[in-house]
Amino acid sequence: MDKSLLYGGLSGVVESCFSHPIDFYKVKYQESVFNGQPRKHMIPFMINQVKTNGFLSLYTGFIPKIVSIIPVRTTFWGVQDICNKNLQIENEMTKYTVSGLVAGFCQTIIETPAEVAKIQMMGHKPSKIVMKNAFNGFRWNAIRNSVFCSAICLSNNYYQKDDKFLKFMVNASSAFVISVVTQPFDFMKTKYQINDHTYKLSFFDAVREYKFKMFSGTFSRAYTGAINMGVGALVFNYLMSY
């Protein structure tokens, strides 16, 4: 077994423990946008959530997340590493971009059903989860993941300095920026997945209907991405160095 597959899964568990509360806030924020409800900033929301429902309520939806994160990050890091070693492409930037595109698409196949379960758990009681549309939002998730993975594959491999803190900052910064860029696709993904029925609105119809609302939850998602990739890449690179 390629060690990158094992270490990729372990890095995913570590990153999720840090980032899940922010991810929970992002989904609840986007849900309030869809429903026309008042929206709260992240810190007041979390304080109120803890006071009302306890600290562990910030980890609602964590079980499907943690169950899925091992194969998801195994794919994310493992496929990148395998592609980087085996793709016969001389230009390194092109090779890392292609590796990221492949890893992102493969990750989406594994991730989407768990994302549907996680998002519906955050918005409804577990008894109301509807999994017949387990691949709702797949195309939007695939676009988002492929672009995101390409950016991280580039930043993690093209930047070859040994300074772990600087590499942490490069990966976290790349994740933050690309999370902002791909936010409209994340909005579409969540819009499809948060509904029990199959949602039919096209991307361009959504742009006309929601306009700047498509960037709701942008910074909470960007913070989540920065934590995930900063911490995840740090753990993965550290383990791979042995």
Residue ranges and their predicted role:
Residues 1-242:
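Matrix-facing interhelical linker segments
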